[in-house]
Regions:
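Rhodanese-like catalytic fold shared by cysteine-dependent sulfurtransferases
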Residues: 1-19, 25-57, 68-110
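Short, surface-exposed ligand- or partner-binding patches at beta-edge/loop junctions that are enriched
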Residues: 61
């Protein structure tokens, strides 16, 4: 569940030049991710705040939208313009948007 004030955008509607922060766990990332995304697992976001790209906005994604919603709320509280990617990587993959894998297999969302 997201805050009514938290901006959301469906994965299928993200602009081609969107700056994306993927907050999934390393095994999820390895199985399939957006090539240009920055990967910082949710448990490391606070400690790695300085590693988050400067972008207005930054789009935050996870598997289905729950973890990314929490991170988006946190980033917004830090003064960072964050947009939650509604539906997450599941919707990204379902809409046919490109993904890459670090496993040597076809990319997938796990």
């Amino acid at each position: 569940m997201t805050s009514p004030d938290l901006p959301e955008q469906p994965a299928s509607d993200l602009p081609a030049d969107a700056v994306i922060l993927d907050v999934r766990e390393p095994d999820e990332w390895a199985a399939g991710h957006i090539e240009a995304a920055v990967h910082i697992p949710i448990g490391q976001v606070t400690a790695r705040l300085a590693d988050i790209p400067q972008a207005d906005p930054i789009y935050v994604i996870c598997r289905g939208g729950g973890r990314s919603s929490r991170v988006s709320e946190f980033l917004s509280a830090q003064g960072i313009e964050a947009v939650n990617v509604a539906g997450g990587m599941q919707d990204w993959a379902a809409s046919g948007r490109p993904m890459v894998s670090d496993t040597g297999r076809a990319p997938e969302v796990i």
